[in-house]
Amino acid sequence: MINKPNQFLNHLDGLKQHFSDYDSLQKSFKKYLSENQTELNNFFFNQFEKIIVLVKKKEFKTAQERCEEELATPYFSKPLVGFFQSLLQLINHDLIEQKNQQLANMSCEKIVEMVLSDYPNKLNLIHYLLAKEASFVNPNLLQRMTFVLTDLELLELKRFSFFKALNQIPAFKNHKVTYFNSKLKQKFVITLGEFAFPQTDKTKQFFQQLIKKVSQLFLKEPVSCEFAYEIIDALLVSFFPLHPNLEVNHLAKKIHQYVSKIVINEVVDLKDPTTKLIVDTLYEQLDRAIGEEN
């Protein structure tokens, strides 16, 4: 198993720059290029420009795929990662806006059909129903979608994200659903809408304490702390609605050790069971666009 994950390192670098529009991002990239003229930088700027052309044509899905391909390049320099991560964020936003326009005039039934078509690739469209009034959504449609929550083949992150959406749709409030956790190999009966986030008090306290402890350990390392939070999010998803059977201080310390090594690209000790748990949990969710669910 790989234990120097470039994807996570790239994510850390991408957190450092934020742009609100394509023009300012393009100008910043050009300025960087004028001060750092290399054959490799010129090549990736040309790739960047080709993606911008797709954006202007409103071919956002193709632009998204091209951008993700570039970010998967292992020899990407840190500044380039920042530019392409920022570009991907802008494209993702426009892609959502484009989908919303297409969905605006659809009935609830049609939207659910789209959610379940090309399964499981369009499950994220369920989030469009969150903004709708309760009267727009037919509660009986829930029965058509509950199989998603017990699909043994579905990635845990996708199942969890789908559950979170169902839990926030007013029309489904007080309906009971069965949720399967593949890591725990357990089924849980949960009442939708009963709690904003259905966990036991013990589990809520566990993650609250874990976040607090990790924050203290990374007090002077805000960027690394963001990565540590990603790990906590991954653990929350993988063990939902429960939590890891570990002592909080021990887990926080292991998260700190792991992130500290990854940031400087050192090999981590996979013989340590807690470190292996962290790595396995992250790799279980590798199709996640880190920080955002596609």
Swiss-Prot record:
Name of this chain's protein: Uncharacterized protein MG237
Top-level division of the source organism's lineage: Bacteria
Organism this protein belongs to: Mycoplasma genitalium (strain ATCC 33530 / DSM 19775 / NCTC 10195 / G37) (Mycoplasmoides genitalium)
Membrane-spanning segments: none
InterPro entries: DUF3196, Uncharacterised_MG237_central, Uncharacterised_MG237_N
